[in-house]
């Protein structure tokens, strides 16, 4: 039986977003919504796996969601107040995890926290909380060059959460990782979703299996086809999958189950048609 959960308030809404450059249609009437999830007496943010073929327009939508680019029409609204997104409201974790190399880990995080907190004491307390929850206290006085790639990723994620409003966009976090590291990143993403009830994560990836492992919802982006099977210009979200409804969330062993493997096969087959 699927775990009982209740969907709470809307945290992010993509509302009829279209994007064109000159005569070229990139995105066409994209709509999607992210809501927080209440389960077992706790609220947690949603983790969305955002999938689509290369060159389909994922990067453009990614930048619009982050408030870095403007759509031709439509809008992206964030927070329970559904405020139009602006640059800085959504944290972006890029593939190379950029940090200030001449500052300690603590200093990197404090710099981020000071952008959001009114007092320096509140900022320090928040940094300490994140270091504790992400098991990085012992590394706090080290410099980025002195820590591992996995630790660097943790710091980059914490940095973006501290200076944004609970939203995190992760660009290809599984790229180039072996199976063990991929599992650790999946574990970390779930930890982040539970750090704060409003933390909301969108993971942009080509990796269907990793996305299905970590996410509670999947978005599949592609183009519509005409009667002859030709792609119609402009991508949109073609499929959304609710993994909570399918009882494939929050079970670490789910990846070995026949049900999960069949679901991944189904998504991969649909992926090939986009």
Q: What do the PLM-derived regions correspond to, one by one?
A:
Residues 157:
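Hydrophobic anchor residue at the start of the ABC signature
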Residues 106-114, 124:
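Short helical segment in ABC ATPase nucleotide-binding domains corresponding to the A-loop/adjacent helical element
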Residues 162-166:
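A short, proline-enriched helix->beta-strand linker immediately N-terminal to the Walker B motif
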Residues 130-148:
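Conserved ABC nucleotide-binding domain
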Residues 182-197:
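Helical segment within the ABC ATPase nucleotide-binding domain
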Residues 168-172:
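Catalytic Walker B motif of ABC-type/P-loop ATPase nucleotide-binding domains
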Residues 74-86:
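Conserved ABC transporter NBD signature motif
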Residues 66:
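Helix-to-loop junction immediately C-terminal to a conserved catalytic motif
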């Amino acid at each position: 039986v699927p775990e009982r959960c209740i969907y709470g308030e809307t945290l992010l809404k993509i509302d009829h977003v279209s994007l064109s450059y000159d005569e070229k249609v990139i995105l066409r009437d994209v709509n999607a919504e992210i809501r927080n999830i209440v389960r077992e007496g706790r609220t947690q943010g949603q983790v969305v796996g955002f999938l689509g073929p290369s060159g389909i327009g994922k990067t453009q939508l990614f930048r619009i969601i982050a408030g870095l680019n403007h759509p031709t029409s439509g809008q992206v609204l964030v927070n329970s107040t559904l405020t139009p997104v602006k640059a800085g409201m959504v944290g972006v974790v890029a593939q190379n995890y950029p940090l200030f190399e001449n500052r300690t880990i603590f200093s990197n995080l404090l710099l981020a926290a000071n952008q959001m907190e009114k007092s320096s004491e509140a900022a320090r307390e928040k940094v300490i909380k994140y270091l504790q929850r992400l098991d990085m206290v012992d590394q706090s006085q080290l410099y980025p060059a002195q820590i591992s790639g996995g630790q660097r990723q943790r710091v980059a994620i914490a940095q973006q959460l501290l200076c944004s409003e609970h939203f995190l966009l992760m660009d290809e976090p599984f790229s180039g990782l072996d199976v063990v590291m991929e599992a650790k990143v999946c574990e970390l993403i779930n930890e982040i979703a539970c750090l704060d009830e409003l933390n909301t994560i969108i993971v942009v990836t080509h990796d269907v299996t990793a996305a299905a492992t970590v996410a509670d919802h999947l978005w599949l982006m592609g183009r519509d086809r005409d009667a002859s099977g030709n792609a119609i210009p402009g991508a949109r979200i073609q499929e959304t999958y609710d993994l909570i409804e399918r009882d494939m969330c929050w079970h670490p062993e789910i990846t070995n189950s026949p049900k999960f493997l069949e679901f991944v096969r189904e998504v991969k087959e649909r992926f090939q048609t986009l």
